[in-house]
Amino acid sequence: MFQDKKQLQYLWIFKPELNDIAKRIAEDHTKWMNETHTKEGDKALLMLNWSIGPEFKDGNKTGNMSLILTEVYENQAGIDNHFDLAKNNGATFRDDFN
């Protein structure tokens, strides 16, 4: 558990036929994060986690898939740095689910 840290969390819902694209997005974003983000200091990325699985509604599978991204940073400076890096280099994170 991370106390007094800053977190970003995103959720995408998509059709199962886009599963390979979702996996590629996760791999590309993870590679970019590992190449550009520090693991120490005020801007530290403390955790990066992806989860992919079926979407549920009222306890039943909908037929769709869900992709969840969680990023935990030491503080707000890490989040600000994250978005600055993405904006300044045309980050490899994109929305291919359309």
Regions found by a protein language model. Name each.
Residues 20-24, 75-85:
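Short amphipathic alpha-helices within nucleic acid-binding modules
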Residues 1-6, 60-63:
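Short, flexible turn/loop "capping" segments at secondary-structure junctions
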Residues 87-98:
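Outer-membrane beta-barrel domain signature
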Residues 5-15, 68-70:
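Active-site-flanking beta-strand signature of metal-NTP-handling nucleotidyl enzymes
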Residues 15-20, 35-39:
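Short acidic-aromatic low-complexity motifs
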Residues 28-36, 85-86:
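Structured segments of extracytoplasmic/periplasmic soluble domains
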Residues 33-68, 97-98:
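Short, glycine- and small/hydrophobic-rich beta-strand elements in well-ordered beta-sheets
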